[in-house]
Amino acid sequence: MKKIWIILCCILLVGCTSTKSDMSQYENFHDENHVFYDMTVKELQSKIQNKETLTVYFGFSKCPSCIEAMPVLNDVAKENHAEVAYINTRKNAAWQSNMDMKDYDVVVNLFGQYLQYDDNGKKHLYTPHVFFIKDGDVVYEVEGVNEQLKENYEKGFALEYE
């Protein structure tokens, strides 16, 4: 019986571990101890429904603004001893738009009030986009890049963990 218990605990631990994101495609980013871990939209949806606290970053490696924002987010997250869920919006090479991403409709359901409308009148997730979620609710979000990017990320983590 004790062996069965140990085996079950090991299975649970393995099933609960996060997969570190492969950020090697991001130009000029070489931090092997980065804070990013892979997450699917469905996993994110589950965490929000379970009222969890997390930071999620939507982006992709060929996005110029993502290339600029990602190292800043990495540094600020490290300063706050936080990890960041990464959802690669162009994981599949056939995806030509963030709207092609798997479960995009779920993203619109979860974050629609924070998304802008595109030229066709559809809600569009522009990248980079970071959501700071506390107890299942968005407490802060940062879209794109600006001169106060570091300060914006710091504010998001402060609100998330206050």
Q: What are the roles of these predicted feature ranges?
A:
Residues 12-15:
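C-terminal motif of bacterial Sec signal peptides marking the signal peptidase cleavage site
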Residues 1-4:
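Positively charged n-region of N-terminal signal peptides that target proteins for export
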Residues 66-81:
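Typically the conserved alpha-helix immediately C-terminal to a functionally engaged Cys/Sec
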